[in-house]
């Protein structure tokens, strides 16, 4: 089964106009623009990074829309990765010059990992079993951010 944003029937790419992120009104465009990543969690939930519309949407495995997180202030939704814990509690999302940390189930934005002067345009994200983040950048190779635990 194919589906578009909000679980809508997708339309041909030629008719999906890219709308400036500054013009968004809630809930946003009814179709995806550039789907830059799709990830399926262990519980079967599907997460879609719609880069040009600067949002992440979650769906059931049969295409029913569940939630959306849009961050229109900066470049958002370049890539997606799950935390390695059994529940995959966190969703990591490429965000401007860092990585947004999001509660996976609620899609609540928690914060951004953005070490000073280290990250460029993070384009692909992956985690390992220890919680380390690996970030491939468009202009500066790859970096590993070592997991040292959660802080307040």
Please annotate each region the language model reported:
Residues 45-48, 89-93, 132-135:
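Conserved beta-propeller blade signature
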Residues 119-152:
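Blade-level signature of beta-propeller repeat domains, shared across WD40, Kelch, NHL, RCC1
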């Amino acid at each position: 089964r194919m589906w578009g944003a909000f679980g809508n029937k997708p339309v041909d790419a030629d008719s999906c106009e890219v709308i400036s992120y500054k013009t968004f009104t809630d809930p946003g465009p009814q179709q995806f623009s550039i789907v830059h990543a799709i990830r399926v969690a262990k519980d079967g939930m599907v997460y879609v990074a719609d880069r040009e519309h600067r949002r992440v949407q979650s769906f059931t495995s049969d295409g029913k829309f569940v939630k959306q997180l849009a961050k229109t202030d900066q470049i958002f939704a370049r890539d997606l990765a799950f935390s390695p814990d059994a529940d995959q509690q966190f969703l990591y999302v490429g965000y401007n010059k860092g990585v947004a940390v999001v509660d996976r189930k609620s899609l609540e934005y928690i914060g951004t990992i953005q070490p000073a002067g280290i990250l460029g345009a993070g384009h692909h994200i992956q985690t390992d079993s220890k919680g380390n983040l690996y970030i491939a950048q468009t202009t500066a190779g790859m970096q590993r951010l070592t997991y040292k635990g959660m802080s307040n």
